């Protein structure tokens, strides 16, 4: 998958056009009949979304996702509470908007001209391309005229209008099925499971799903990069879109959108099939025996992140040893182990406890200006290449007019610490910054895979239990005597 990035020119153009369209309405947020007044009167902002690794999901019983975080900030900006409705498919989302059950659709939706006939698009906050996906091990199609199986796409998706345009323009025999009960992510799952041959999804969703289902692969792009946006009702009054424009401009100026982009998209761009398959196999075969230790000693960070750090260090091998003498699950040096009262570095529990304590210590040392949810990445870089070199990277970032408190800005300077023209400007000199960069990115990918894989397994288990419960209800159990003597169990006439 190609490297994901913000299309700033496209975002800027859409924002300017939207600003010009909304300019007359911006001053009157406080009107008695406008949408913003309705939202403030009821005290809640209603959004509809779908479950996906990017838009909305729960982790540790708390909501997360890029669209969720933006929507929560927008609700706070308006001074109201956020109400989230999760729908099973895209078609239901747009029904919510048409039926006035939602103020905004925040679900990673592509800017689409057909949708503008009924709905209004808001500002864009990242961009994607539409891609055809198939399963590794099957024949790779060269183009849409070369499909050897059935193409299935989600009802209500922008992919349908793209296919209609391509059919009219280039492939008149092109045909496809429309799924009314699955989201695009659900169809990606179906391709991974071998239940359907092909589907179309956006490049970001594919990159995220490959961390859980590495058997997914991209055949080719269907479109160029397109903006992703929120949708609202098409009303004469534009107060809601005007407020959204102001909000997104504020979030962009404050660096919030860039931080969310880094948090949710910054580590998605590269994909290693073999490494991902090996990691998922280790989750099944090795993690069950040591999971309780990560859960027990993960104090300041999520246990799955601690597990990802350990996998990057040792592949969960308690006897791992490097040529430099570091050992164990967390690959501690002798001096670090001594400072943490770890007497046996090859003891899994001692090593995990010590590594967790050391990581907590490193996070506490990170300068206070760094946002709470980014401190761990700075700490990991310091853990890998040394705290002093991490400070050098921050200073170099500031010298180059970047934000030293932003991981997105600092991480791209890490490789510069191994180049003389840059490290000669630093206090502590040469460092293997490219290794620290790769180290942190790998951990983030492992964490993403681990969280998604475990959630997917829980989802499948819940579906299985629900199916079994439905079966039991349809065919209730009977007493053994009644089963052996069915006639005697019947009521007398």
Curated annotation (Swiss-Prot):
Q: Which Gene3D superfamilies does the protein's record reference?
A: 1.10.530.10, Periplasmic binding protein-like II
Q: Where is the active site?
A: 313
GO molecular-function terms, A-Z:
peptidoglycan lytic transglycosylase activity
Keywords assigned: Cell outer membrane, Cell wall biogenesis/degradation, Lyase, Membrane, Signal
Q: One short Pfam family name for this protein?
A: SBP_bac_3
Q: Which reaction does it catalyse?
A: Exolytic cleavage of the (1->4)-beta-glycosidic linkage between N-acetylmuramic acid (MurNAc) and N-acetylglucosamine (GlcNAc) residues in peptidoglycan, from either the reducing or the non-reducing ends of the peptidoglycan chains, with concomitant formation of a 1,6-anhydrobond in the MurNAc residue
Region of interest called LT domain, as start-end residue ranges on this chain: 269-493
List the subcellular locations: Cell outer membrane
What are the record's GO terms for cellular component? cell outer membrane
Q: Which family does it belong to?
A: In the N-terminal section; belongs to the bacterial solute-binding protein 3 family.
Role: Murein-degrading enzyme that degrades murein glycan strands and insoluble, high-molecular weight murein sacculi, with the concomitant formation of a 1,6-anhydromuramoyl product. Lytic transglycosylases (LTs) play an integral role in the metabolism of the peptidoglycan (PG) sacculus. Their lytic action creates space within the PG sacculus to allow for its expansion as well as for the insertion of various structures such as secretion systems and flagella.
Protein name, entry field: Membrane-bound lytic murein transglycosylase F
Top-down, what is the taxonomic lineage of the species of origin?
Bacteria, Pseudomonadati, Pseudomonadota, Gammaproteobacteria, Enterobacterales
